[in-house]
Amino acid sequence: MPAFPYADDLAEELASMAGEVPATVSVLGLAAPEQSAVQRRLEELVLAVAGPRDGASLETVTHQDRTTVWLPGRLRAVGFHASGSMTVHLDMPPSEDLFENDPGDAELTGMLRAAGDQIGLPSLVPAEDELLFERLWRVKAAGERRTEPSLCRALGSFRHYVRDLPVYGRASSTVELGASGGVTSLSVSTRRFAGDGGGARVAEPEVRTPAQAAREVAARVAESFAGMEDTRLTPQWFRFGYLSLGRRRPQTLLTPFYIASIRVQSETEVSAHVTAVPGCAGRFSPTLNLVPKPRRVA
């Protein structure tokens, strides 16, 4: 491991954050998204979000890497051919459908769960998988006068679980709501869809220990920050699960990874550094560079 202050401490702290991990884990094959299936799912999602159309017809345009669907004057949606990911955005000004007051976490979370169920999010993934609510955010804005920011939107994220393991990467799904409970935007970024034919077990390798993975993370971080020894590194979390690549990138396997988030503090900036290392040894351990090397500030 390259010499770097805190490297050994960093590895120990990360390893202690991992919690229990299984002794072995399934490497799963993924079905290549078919363009026709991406379009069908996208159009079905648009209709579920839009509700009654008053006779308006969908307009669909297929590009090399994506399919775009419009409901004129209502919404725009995009489906990505490489991954099957989808986004839907309603044509609603941000100043409309605002909350008069904040109803609290429990009510907002309930609204988001209900909206997800109503548009059929759980049915998008295979029956043996789960799409579980993960986190609530509030989108707020303040007026010209010095007043408490108003709650504009409630935003919830959902996490896809495959064989009881979370699939990390971007949020598996997000739902944004206005005060009426209507969806204002939506995203779905799961790698497995109901009926897509994927999910076959390719292998069942042994899982690396958290200590082994943490040492690799520390070594990578030490290499990335070589020459910047005054930088302070603080581990935020260290998790085990599957990893989904970006929505514009194809992916043939779900393989296990350890993923670390590290707070980076220097004299000039504070940022977060995310590193993923393989969760198993052998041919199912691709190397990923999720974050570019840090920029040195003179």
Could you tell me what each predicted segment is?
Residues 274-298:
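Mixed-charge, low-complexity segments
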Residues 1-141, 147-148, 152-153, 160-162, ...:
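Preferential activation on post-signal-peptide N-terminal prodomains/segments
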Residues 89-276, 297-298:
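Segments that shape or occlude catalytic/ligand-binding pockets
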Residues 33, 245, 283-286:
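Intrinsically disordered, low-complexity, compositionally biased regions/tails
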